[in-house]
């Protein structure tokens, strides 16, 4: 299914947005085909009816498949910027006169030699970049409010790309403002003390989700935000054309894409998010044309592969949840390539107990120890491990 645009809602408490549509468990699919639930209802009605029920009419919509096609990255997402603002404090989408879409927030960072923690209340999906390099995300769905940042130099550029998702439209959470809600701050340990910086002097740029803005971005020679924008590929606007000899309803498969919106021949087809479970967008045949057709995709995360196709059945139950590579499920191997060790060094030669002392406090859910020989770098085994606190207690 799809809501043909942006008006999906979200459940609360917590934040559980509908990616692109509500599922009310109806008796018919979008293409008017009867569901299993319809046939069960019909069987129940027939059981208590004294007359034979009329025959099920044939579905009026014809389903077609569209061959796999590759889209080209035509323009950076920043080319969709149509309005900019500057403020001492970050401002919301609503203060920028925008109900949905994405916003770019930019400010400068202080020098922090040890790395820091970014504290942020972002509605709804925030991606962080330092000098154009992606450093992480803050996802409201997971109730995330912090992000670990690497060491920074004075004047390093922090860019936050914030996308609005479904709105809570009931209860105490009905005032569901989008964007950065409140102050954004950094905390870090400096000489044993926790120091806090509240980030000020923000520059904002709005990117509306509309077909006209997409066309503008595809043809824009440069961004209105100029040198302030530094969003890397593969985030951006993608486009392709394809030809059809016959039209009919179809389901566009978006499972290789990241997160964003699809336009078909000028119509807002719906939103997508790779995590699913819905991986297809229903496309009514009346929006397709014999001859040349156009698809524009706005992806605020970037695709795994910029391909899509039309199929004659929906894919509504395929989860592709983001998984952490640092966990201790049986049979799993943590990925520590990008992790900064708390302690490293060589143990004494020989068997027996060895003591490893952390030079600073460390907090986490799991302890991972990577051991290898000094001769050829191959892994070695550890028989027992005991963790002790600063008082020597296990």
Labelled PLM ranges:
Residues 164-175, 303-312, 353, 376-389:
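Edge beta-strands of jelly-roll/beta-sandwich modules across compartments, strongly enriched
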Residues 105-107, 143-147, 238-240, 277-281, ...:
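Short strand-edge motifs at loop-to-beta-strand transitions and within beta-strands
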Residues 269, 332-340, 347-394:
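Aromatic, loop-rich ligand-recognition surfaces of beta-strand-rich domains
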